[in-house]
Protein backbone atom coordinates (compact mmCIF):
# COMPACT_ATOMS: atom_id res chain seq x y z
CA UNK A 1 0.00 0.00 0.00
CA UNK A 2 2.81 2.38 0.95
CA UNK A 3 4.50 1.54 -2.32
CA UNK A 4 1.28 2.31 -4.21
CA UNK A 5 0.86 5.66 -2.41
CA UNK A 6 4.47 6.51 -3.16
CA UNK A 7 3.97 5.78 -6.85
CA UNK A 8 0.70 7.75 -6.87
CA UNK A 9 2.37 10.75 -5.18
CA UNK A 10 5.23 10.64 -7.67
CA UNK A 11 2.78 10.57 -10.56
CA UNK A 12 0.87 13.56 -9.17
CA UNK A 13 4.13 15.48 -8.80
CA UNK A 14 5.15 14.68 -12.38
CA UNK A 15 1.77 15.81 -13.70
CA UNK A 16 1.93 18.94 -11.58
CA UNK A 17 5.39 19.80 -12.88
CA UNK A 18 4.28 19.09 -16.43
CA UNK A 19 1.34 21.43 -15.99
CA UNK A 20 3.65 24.14 -14.65
CA UNK A 21 5.97 23.59 -17.57
CA UNK A 22 3.11 23.82 -20.02
CA UNK A 23 2.00 27.11 -18.47
CA UNK A 24 5.49 28.57 -18.77
CA UNK A 25 5.61 27.49 -22.39
CA UNK A 26 2.35 29.27 -23.23
CA UNK A 27 3.05 31.55 -26.21
CA UNK A 28 3.33 35.23 -25.40
CA UNK A 29 0.61 35.82 -27.94
CA UNK A 30 -1.92 33.83 -25.87
CA UNK A 31 -1.01 35.69 -22.68
CA UNK A 32 -1.33 39.01 -24.48
CA UNK A 33 -4.98 38.34 -25.27
CA UNK A 34 -5.98 38.62 -21.61
CA UNK A 35 -8.38 41.53 -21.07
CA UNK A 36 -8.22 43.37 -17.75
CA UNK A 37 -11.29 44.27 -15.70
CA UNK A 38 -11.22 47.84 -17.06
CA UNK A 39 -11.33 46.56 -20.65
CA UNK A 40 -7.66 47.20 -21.39
CA UNK A 41 -4.90 44.74 -22.17
CA UNK A 42 -1.39 44.76 -20.80
CA UNK A 43 1.14 46.20 -23.24
CA UNK A 44 3.33 43.45 -24.67
CA UNK A 45 4.85 45.24 -27.68
CA UNK A 46 5.96 48.86 -28.15
CA UNK A 47 6.77 49.73 -31.76
CA UNK A 48 9.04 52.68 -32.45
CA UNK A 49 8.14 54.26 -35.79
CA UNK A 50 10.55 56.68 -37.46
CA UNK A 51 10.09 59.41 -40.04
CA UNK A 52 12.47 62.00 -41.42
CA UNK A 53 9.71 64.60 -41.41
CA UNK A 54 8.50 66.95 -38.68
CA UNK A 55 5.25 67.16 -36.74
CA UNK A 56 3.84 69.74 -39.14
CA UNK A 57 3.98 67.33 -42.07
CA UNK A 58 1.17 65.33 -43.63
CA UNK A 59 3.24 62.22 -42.91
CA UNK A 60 3.03 62.90 -39.18
CA UNK A 61 -0.72 63.41 -39.54
CA UNK A 62 -0.95 59.88 -40.90
CA UNK A 63 1.37 58.39 -38.29
CA UNK A 64 -0.57 60.03 -35.45
CA UNK A 65 -3.75 58.44 -36.80
CA UNK A 66 -1.94 55.09 -37.07
CA UNK A 67 -0.86 55.40 -33.44
CA UNK A 68 -4.41 56.19 -32.31
CA UNK A 69 -6.00 53.33 -34.22
CA UNK A 70 -3.48 50.71 -33.13
CA UNK A 71 -3.57 51.61 -29.45
CA UNK A 72 -7.35 51.97 -29.40
CA UNK A 73 -8.15 48.76 -31.26
CA UNK A 74 -5.59 46.59 -29.44
CA UNK A 75 -6.88 48.04 -26.14
CA UNK A 76 -3.38 49.23 -25.32
CA UNK A 77 -1.65 45.90 -25.90
CA UNK A 78 0.37 47.36 -28.78
CA UNK A 79 1.84 50.82 -28.25
CA UNK A 80 3.20 53.09 -30.99
CA UNK A 81 5.97 55.63 -30.33
CA UNK A 82 6.58 58.09 -33.19
CA UNK A 83 10.06 59.54 -33.73
CA UNK A 84 10.17 62.56 -36.06
CA UNK A 85 12.90 64.65 -37.71
CA UNK A 86 15.16 61.68 -38.44
CA UNK A 87 15.55 60.75 -34.77
CA UNK A 88 15.92 57.08 -35.78
CA UNK A 89 18.24 57.99 -38.65
CA UNK A 90 17.89 59.09 -42.25
CA UNK A 91 15.52 57.12 -44.47
CA UNK A 92 18.47 55.20 -45.88
CA UNK A 93 19.69 54.38 -42.38
CA UNK A 94 16.21 53.32 -41.33
CA UNK A 95 15.99 51.02 -44.36
CA UNK A 96 19.19 49.31 -43.27
CA UNK A 97 18.03 49.24 -39.65
CA UNK A 98 14.78 47.52 -40.61
CA UNK A 99 16.73 44.61 -42.09
CA UNK A 100 19.16 44.43 -39.15
CA UNK A 101 16.50 44.69 -36.46
CA UNK A 102 17.82 47.96 -35.02
CA UNK A 103 14.75 49.85 -36.28
CA UNK A 104 11.23 48.61 -35.51
CA UNK A 105 9.31 50.53 -38.13
CA UNK A 106 9.70 53.46 -40.51
CA UNK A 107 7.95 55.51 -43.16
CA UNK A 108 10.24 55.46 -46.20
CA UNK A 109 10.20 57.07 -49.63
CA UNK A 110 10.56 55.01 -52.78
CA UNK A 111 14.33 55.51 -53.23
CA UNK A 112 14.91 54.22 -49.71
CA UNK A 113 12.59 51.26 -50.27
CA UNK A 114 14.66 50.52 -53.38
CA UNK A 115 17.66 49.94 -51.10
CA UNK A 116 15.81 46.81 -49.95
CA UNK A 117 14.62 45.80 -53.42
CA UNK A 118 16.31 47.55 -56.33
CA UNK A 119 13.50 46.87 -58.80
CA UNK A 120 11.20 49.06 -56.69
CA UNK A 121 12.78 51.91 -58.66
CA UNK A 122 10.46 50.94 -61.52
CA UNK A 123 7.94 53.31 -59.94
CA UNK A 124 10.30 56.23 -60.69
CA UNK A 125 9.83 55.90 -64.44
CA UNK A 126 8.52 59.18 -65.91
CA UNK A 127 4.80 59.64 -66.53
CA UNK A 128 4.13 56.06 -65.47
CA UNK A 129 0.85 56.95 -63.74
CA UNK A 130 -2.15 58.78 -65.17
CA UNK A 131 -3.62 60.06 -61.90
CA UNK A 132 -4.21 59.25 -58.23
CA UNK A 133 -6.83 56.61 -59.02
CA UNK A 134 -4.27 54.80 -61.17
CA UNK A 135 -1.71 55.06 -58.35
CA UNK A 136 -4.10 53.65 -55.76
CA UNK A 137 -5.14 50.76 -58.00
CA UNK A 138 -1.53 49.75 -58.66
CA UNK A 139 -0.36 49.82 -55.05
CA UNK A 140 -3.47 48.12 -53.67
CA UNK A 141 -3.37 45.56 -56.47
CA UNK A 142 -1.01 42.95 -57.87
CA UNK A 143 2.07 45.18 -58.42
CA UNK A 144 1.92 46.44 -54.84
CA UNK A 145 1.57 42.90 -53.50
CA UNK A 146 4.43 41.71 -55.70
CA UNK A 147 6.84 44.05 -53.93
CA UNK A 148 5.38 43.26 -50.51
CA UNK A 149 6.20 39.61 -51.15
CA UNK A 150 9.64 40.32 -52.62
CA UNK A 151 10.77 42.46 -49.69
CA UNK A 152 9.33 40.08 -47.09
CA UNK A 153 10.99 37.06 -48.69
CA UNK A 154 14.39 38.69 -49.23
CA UNK A 155 14.67 41.09 -46.27
CA UNK A 156 12.14 39.86 -43.68
CA UNK A 157 10.57 43.33 -43.67
CA UNK A 158 6.82 43.83 -44.04
CA UNK A 159 5.20 46.69 -45.96
CA UNK A 160 2.14 47.55 -43.89
CA UNK A 161 0.73 49.98 -46.43
CA UNK A 162 1.63 52.35 -49.24
CA UNK A 163 1.16 56.05 -48.50
CA UNK A 164 1.45 59.19 -50.61
CA UNK A 165 4.12 61.78 -51.32
CA UNK A 166 2.49 63.14 -54.44
CA UNK A 167 3.44 63.78 -58.04
CA UNK A 168 6.67 65.67 -58.61
CA UNK A 169 6.84 68.83 -60.71
CA UNK A 170 9.63 70.97 -62.15
CA UNK A 171 10.20 74.57 -61.10
CA UNK A 172 12.78 77.20 -62.08
CA UNK A 173 13.79 80.81 -61.59
CA UNK A 174 14.59 81.34 -65.30
CA UNK A 175 11.38 81.46 -67.34
CA UNK A 176 7.96 79.93 -67.84
CA UNK A 177 7.82 76.21 -68.60
CA UNK A 178 5.23 75.82 -71.33
CA UNK A 179 6.54 72.55 -72.75
CA UNK A 180 9.40 70.06 -72.47
CA UNK A 181 11.53 72.15 -74.83
CA UNK A 182 11.72 74.84 -72.13
CA UNK A 183 13.79 72.50 -69.94
CA UNK A 184 16.75 72.52 -72.32
CA UNK A 185 19.96 73.88 -70.85
CA UNK A 186 18.66 74.07 -67.27
CA UNK A 187 20.64 72.80 -64.29
CA UNK A 188 18.08 70.98 -62.14
CA UNK A 189 18.62 69.58 -58.68
CA UNK A 190 17.28 66.02 -58.38
CA UNK A 191 17.55 63.20 -55.81
CA UNK A 192 20.37 60.75 -56.45
CA UNK A 193 18.34 58.47 -58.70
CA UNK A 194 19.46 57.18 -62.11
CA UNK A 195 15.96 57.30 -63.58
CA UNK A 196 15.49 60.92 -62.54
CA UNK A 197 18.87 61.76 -64.08
CA UNK A 198 17.93 60.01 -67.33
CA UNK A 199 14.57 61.81 -67.38
CA UNK A 200 16.18 65.23 -67.01
CA UNK A 201 18.76 64.36 -69.67
CA UNK A 202 16.01 63.34 -72.09
CA UNK A 203 14.52 66.80 -71.58
CA UNK A 204 17.87 68.42 -72.36
CA UNK A 205 18.63 69.45 -68.78
CA UNK A 206 21.72 68.74 -66.70
CA UNK A 207 21.46 67.71 -63.07
CA UNK A 208 22.89 68.23 -59.61
CA UNK A 209 22.34 65.94 -56.63
CA UNK A 210 23.28 68.36 -53.88
CA UNK A 211 21.70 67.80 -50.47
CA UNK A 212 18.08 68.84 -50.10
CA UNK A 213 19.08 70.89 -47.05
CA UNK A 214 21.29 73.00 -49.33
CA UNK A 215 18.72 73.41 -52.09
CA UNK A 216 16.97 76.60 -50.95
CA UNK A 217 20.27 78.48 -50.77
CA UNK A 218 21.37 77.03 -54.12
CA UNK A 219 18.17 78.29 -55.75
CA UNK A 220 18.57 81.65 -54.05
CA UNK A 221 22.13 82.24 -55.26
CA UNK A 222 21.38 80.61 -58.63
CA UNK A 223 23.86 77.77 -58.19
CA UNK A 224 21.08 75.69 -59.75
CA UNK A 225 18.36 76.87 -62.11
CA UNK A 226 15.59 74.76 -60.70
CA UNK A 227 14.42 71.77 -58.74
CA UNK A 228 11.58 69.27 -58.67
CA UNK A 229 9.20 67.94 -56.07
CA UNK A 230 5.56 67.82 -54.95
CA UNK A 231 3.53 70.99 -54.52
CA UNK A 232 3.21 70.64 -50.74
CA UNK A 233 7.01 70.53 -50.33
CA UNK A 234 7.39 73.61 -52.55
CA UNK A 235 5.08 75.44 -50.14
CA UNK A 236 6.37 73.98 -46.88
CA UNK A 237 10.01 74.74 -47.69
CA UNK A 238 9.31 78.23 -49.08
CA UNK A 239 10.70 77.59 -52.55
CA UNK A 240 8.21 80.15 -53.87
CA UNK A 241 10.62 82.76 -52.52
CA UNK A 242 13.37 81.66 -54.90
CA UNK A 243 11.52 79.90 -57.76
CA UNK A 244 8.91 81.83 -59.73
CA UNK A 245 7.91 79.34 -62.43
CA UNK A 246 6.39 75.86 -62.08
CA UNK A 247 4.83 73.29 -64.37
CA UNK A 248 2.48 70.65 -62.98
CA UNK A 249 3.91 67.98 -65.24
CA UNK A 250 3.77 65.23 -62.60
CA UNK A 251 6.78 63.48 -64.11
CA UNK A 252 7.24 61.05 -61.22
CA UNK A 253 4.94 59.80 -58.49
CA UNK A 254 6.68 59.21 -55.16
CA UNK A 255 5.16 56.54 -52.98
CA UNK A 256 5.83 56.19 -49.25
CA UNK A 257 5.90 52.78 -47.59
CA UNK A 258 5.10 52.20 -43.91
CA UNK A 259 7.34 49.24 -43.05
CA UNK A 260 8.00 47.03 -40.02
CA UNK A 261 10.83 44.69 -39.11
CA UNK A 262 9.86 41.03 -39.48
CA UNK A 263 10.84 39.98 -35.95
CA UNK A 264 8.72 42.78 -34.48
CA UNK A 265 5.85 41.82 -36.77
CA UNK A 266 6.02 38.20 -35.66
CA UNK A 267 5.79 39.20 -31.99
CA UNK A 268 2.21 40.27 -32.63
CA UNK A 269 -0.71 37.89 -32.32
CA UNK A 270 -2.56 37.11 -35.53
CA UNK A 271 -5.44 39.28 -34.32
CA UNK A 272 -3.15 42.21 -33.58
CA UNK A 273 -1.40 41.81 -36.93
CA UNK A 274 -4.77 42.31 -38.60
CA UNK A 275 -5.44 45.37 -36.44
CA UNK A 276 -2.05 46.91 -37.22
CA UNK A 277 -2.38 46.23 -40.95
CA UNK A 278 -5.87 47.74 -41.06
CA UNK A 279 -4.73 50.73 -38.99
CA UNK A 280 -1.93 51.36 -41.50
CA UNK A 281 -4.44 51.24 -44.35
CA UNK A 282 -6.95 53.54 -42.64
CA UNK A 283 -4.26 56.00 -41.54
CA UNK A 284 -2.90 55.96 -45.09
CA UNK A 285 -6.28 57.13 -46.36
CA UNK A 286 -6.12 60.04 -43.91
CA UNK A 287 -2.58 60.92 -45.04
CA UNK A 288 -3.46 60.71 -48.74
CA UNK A 289 -6.60 62.79 -48.31
CA UNK A 290 -4.65 65.45 -46.41
CA UNK A 291 -2.07 65.78 -49.20
CA UNK A 292 -4.46 65.57 -52.14
CA UNK A 293 -7.25 67.77 -50.77
CA UNK A 294 -4.81 70.56 -49.93
CA UNK A 295 -3.25 70.93 -53.38
CA UNK A 296 -5.80 73.34 -54.89
CA UNK A 297 -5.47 75.64 -51.90
CA UNK A 298 -1.68 75.44 -52.05
CA UNK A 299 -1.64 76.29 -55.77
CA UNK A 300 -3.84 79.30 -55.05
CA UNK A 301 -1.44 80.36 -52.30
CA UNK A 302 1.56 80.04 -54.63
CA UNK A 303 -0.13 82.14 -57.27
CA UNK A 304 -0.81 84.79 -54.63
CA UNK A 305 2.94 84.75 -53.93
CA UNK A 306 3.62 85.51 -57.58
CA UNK A 307 4.48 82.03 -58.83
CA UNK A 308 3.44 81.47 -62.46
CA UNK A 309 2.12 77.92 -62.72
CA UNK A 310 1.39 75.93 -65.86
CA UNK A 311 -1.48 73.87 -64.48
CA UNK A 312 -2.47 72.08 -67.70
CA UNK A 313 0.61 71.06 -69.66
CA UNK A 314 0.39 68.79 -72.68
CA UNK A 315 1.23 65.53 -70.89
CA UNK A 316 1.64 63.60 -74.12
CA UNK A 317 4.38 65.97 -75.25
CA UNK A 318 6.27 65.29 -72.00
CA UNK A 319 5.76 61.53 -72.37
CA UNK A 320 7.06 61.63 -75.92
CA UNK A 321 10.10 63.66 -74.88
CA UNK A 322 11.07 61.09 -72.22
CA UNK A 323 10.19 57.88 -74.09
CA UNK A 324 13.89 57.01 -74.39
CA UNK A 325 14.05 56.51 -70.61
CA UNK A 326 11.83 53.44 -70.97
CA UNK A 327 14.13 52.02 -73.63
CA UNK A 328 17.06 52.58 -71.30
CA UNK A 329 15.54 50.77 -68.30
CA UNK A 330 13.16 48.19 -69.78
CA UNK A 331 15.69 45.37 -69.45
CA UNK A 332 16.46 46.35 -65.86
CA UNK A 333 12.88 46.23 -64.63
CA UNK A 334 11.22 44.05 -67.22
CA UNK A 335 8.99 45.23 -70.05
CA UNK A 336 6.13 43.04 -68.81
CA UNK A 337 6.12 44.61 -65.33
CA UNK A 338 6.33 48.12 -66.78
CA UNK A 339 3.42 47.41 -69.13
CA UNK A 340 1.39 45.89 -66.31
CA UNK A 341 1.82 49.03 -64.19
CA UNK A 342 1.19 51.46 -67.06
CA UNK A 343 -1.95 49.65 -68.17
CA UNK A 344 -3.26 48.56 -64.76
CA UNK A 345 -7.06 48.99 -64.63
CA UNK A 346 -8.45 51.66 -62.34
Please provide the spans of the model-predicted regions.
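C-terminal motif of bacterial Sec signal peptides marking the signal peptidase cleavage site
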Residues: 16-19
